[in-house]
Amino acid sequence: MATEGRGKETNEIKTHFTTREGLYRLLPHSEYSRPNRVPFNSQGSNPVRVSFVNLNDQTGNGNRLCFSVGRELYVYIYKGVRKAADLSKPIDKRIYKGTQPTCHDFNHLTATAESVSLLVGFSAGQVQLIDPIKKETSKLFNEERLIDKSRVTCVKWVPGSDSLFLVAHSSGNMYSYNVEHTYGTTAPHYQLLKQGESFAVHNCKSKSTRDLKWTVGEGALNEFAFSPDGKFLACVSQDGFLRVFNFDSAELHGTMKSYFGGLLCLCWSPDGKYIVTGGEDDLVTVWSFLDCRVIARGRGHKSWVSVVAFDPYTTSVEESDPMEFSDSDKNFQDLLHFGRDRANSTQSRLSKQNSTDSRPVSVTYRFGSVGQDTQLCLWDLTEDILFPHQPLSRARAHANVMNATGLPAGSNGSAVTTPGNSVPPPLPRSNSLPHSAVSNAASKGSVMDGAITSGVSKFALLSLHDRKERHHEKDRKRNHSMGHISSKSSDKLNLVNKAKTDPAKTLGTSLCPRMEDVPLLEPLICKKIAHERLTVLVFLEDCIVTACQEGFICTWARPGKVSKFQP
């Protein structure tokens, strides 16, 4: 498969590719762009960004698409693979002067057919809250740039909240906001709450707000993402480090260093057990949340990796007998149904497996990456990589596919985290099998066995109903969590060991294993799909969405979906 993907050097733009599920096809009529369809001159502009939200309306057209190109921002009804895009009827269109949108995020919790909250970050540091359906601009945060003057790199709603959101800047700082708070016209004053190696958390002294300021690493904070259960926050920075925090307590859970250069992007696996990163080393790196270590790297791109994303619809638990696939809607719909219902089916499949036969269970995670080399790569993370040194057994597979509701035992950061103020010992060198340097996963068996008791995997995704019931309580706890974070006196905080890890000394340690010390993944496919660098990769139920810097948002129909397309 890898040879098919890499193939000969060519400038030909691919319009289809094949995986084990079947044929993926580009749908030209489902392409979204600026209404004039003229390629955007990307010189000096921020990356094109895309956000989705589903309004759960009764018309069947519940998906909404927001994308930013240069100084322009558009919101459309996203018709996906079924109908052609109508660029003449945007829900909302905005053109900004003096600044450019850099990122945006819908609030999925509060979205309805009548109203949706959209956060937009800008190159000058401001953040705007708008409702593209009601056409109302609700609020502008950091309006006078008193909080931070640098470019907004990432903005996201706090999971389960209708009012809290987090904003990262190229300064390396990250700020929490509350849409219900009033922000003054003077610069805020912060006091130190917690400090660790290469990070510090401050509290705003204002009586009207209790917002936090995080300073993480050195250089720009390029992206952050919440774990599927909302308890942990992962950040990647220009200094090349991945850092994972307990969000409420601001405790550092674990870190990882890139092979070279800055880390630009990351994504959690649907069950919260793994994080994939990409960056300036042209690699994708898979990091285990439970073990706090790199478990694999992937080499397929020829330039910086700009986006990584897991595909929850092909991430699966399967019996040893392979599933039959064909280019038909029925078979692929069965696969999607299985993907959506993994939470319920995982236990039933494993129980049935244990009671009927001895066929092993296989765990496969699918993720994708796009880069500045204009290539799309798809990767499979399989059980031989996840659990080296051990024969595949039903008990082992059972232990590792359960307990994704809360993150694994030991996730408080104390049980498995390498102390942040010291460089881990070097890994053993090996010129034979790449697994030789990987620690024996059997030592984690007791942790994994305890994880089983927490219940059936839900891939850490709360239902909309559950989130609405819980978000008020979460907001109350997070608004008062500073007492927990600041439990130590300021004197003790000032005595925290400020020693910094020397990046040059991390190579060959568990923070940054050598290339020969961890398994090297080859892409399933690696296809050139655009003329300009790729900046977007989103996996939806019936398609894959990509976008390039020319401003074209492309829809790739999954196998079996093209036949029902309506112009």
Swiss-Prot record:
Q: Which SUPFAM superfamilies match?
A: WD40 repeat-like
Keyword Cytoplasm part of the UniProt annotation: yes
The record, for SMART domains, names:
WD40
GO molecular function term, any single one: deubiquitinase activator activity
Name the residue ranges with Polar residues bias.
411-421, 429-441
Q: Which branch of life, at top level? A: Eukaryota
Query: What are the record's GO terms for cellular component?
Result: cytoplasm; nucleus
Keywords of the record: Acetylation, Cytoplasm, Nucleus, Phosphoprotein, Repeat, WD repeat
Sequence positions bearing N-acetylalanine: A2
Cellular localization per UniProt: Cytoplasm; Nucleus
Can you say where the WD repeats lie in this chain?
147-187, 216-257, 258-297, 345-389, 529-566
Q: Where is the composition biased (Basic residues)?
A: 468-481
Q: Which Pfam families match?
A: WD40
Modification Phosphoserine, positions:
S355, S358, S430, S432, S463
Q: Where is this region: Disordered?
A: 408-441, 468-493
Give the multimer and partner information.
Interacts with USP12; promotes translocation of USP12/WDR20 to the plasma membrane. Component of the USP12/WDR20/WDR48 deubiquitinating complex. Interacts with USP46; contributes to the cytoplasmic localization of the USP46/WDR20 complex. Component of the USP12/DMWD/WDR48 deubiquitinating complex.
Main role? Regulator of deubiquitinating complexes. Activates deubiquitinating activity of complexes containing USP12. Anchors at the base of the ubiquitin-contacting loop of USP12 and remotely modulates the catalytic center of the enzyme. Regulates shuttling of complexes containing USP12 between the plasma membrane, cytoplasm and nucleus.
Q: What is this protein called?
A: WD repeat-containing protein 20
Organism of provenance: Mus musculus (Mouse)
Tell me the lineage of the source organism. Answer: Eukaryota, Metazoa, Chordata, Craniata, Vertebrata
